[in-house]
Amino acid sequence: MKITTLGRGSIGGTLARLWTKAGHEVTMFGRDGGDASDADVVLVAVPSGVVPDALTRVTGLDGKVVLDATNRMTATPPAGYPSIAEYLKAQTGGPTAKVFNLNFGALLEQAAQTSPKPGNIWVGDEAARAAVEKLTRDIGMEPLHGGSLELASVQEAFAVMLMGIVGDRDEGLLYYRFASPQTF
């Protein structure tokens, strides 16, 4: 799969390395942008407050599968949109998913060696499912579909709560897993 990541930081950079290792062709853009025309999938992993500006610097986004890994810890979605993911869909017109925003970049590289497999909650368009599930499994995680893109604002809010859980624990960062009892 040809993937463009918009963002080279903890999430974007780590996923790019893992996907390259899994055999995907990955191009990384910083906030300066570039041309994503050749991409099958575009990962948006920049700070939420710069999403609108960053998008103006990327061409070739029309109709692409867009994976939104942003979190709006302090920023609000662009005016008129309940979530950043829905804003991204409106700008690109392609299948969109809110995904990889509930994971910690520092732990992503360890996911493949973790048992049971950590979960990766996502919401989004059905047309994005194949890409989301393949790219999630390719890094050693289990995709957990939570519903349609209209739930992206709920997932964004959950990210804030997850940061509270992490901040309240002495152990630091964490994986999460939802599974039937017989899988543990």
Model-derived features with residue positions:
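NAD(P)+-binding Rossmann beta1-loop-alpha1 motif at the extreme N-terminus of oxidoreductases
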Residues: 1-34, 38
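Hydrophobic Val/Ile/Leu positions in short beta-strands of Rossmann-like dinucleotide-binding domains
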Residues: 3-5, 44, 122
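Rossmann-fold NAD(P)-dependent oxidoreductase module
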Residues: 14, 18, 91, 135
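General beta-strand structural signal in soluble alpha/beta enzymes
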Residues: 28-29, 95-101, 144-146
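Rossmann-like NAD(P)-binding element
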Residues: 33-65, 69-72
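Short, structured coil segments at secondary-structure junctions
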Residues: 61-62, 91-92, 139
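Rossmann-fold NAD(P)-binding glycine/threonine-rich loop
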Residues: 70-113
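Active-site-lining helix/loop region of Rossmann-like oxidoreductase modules
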Residues: 118-184
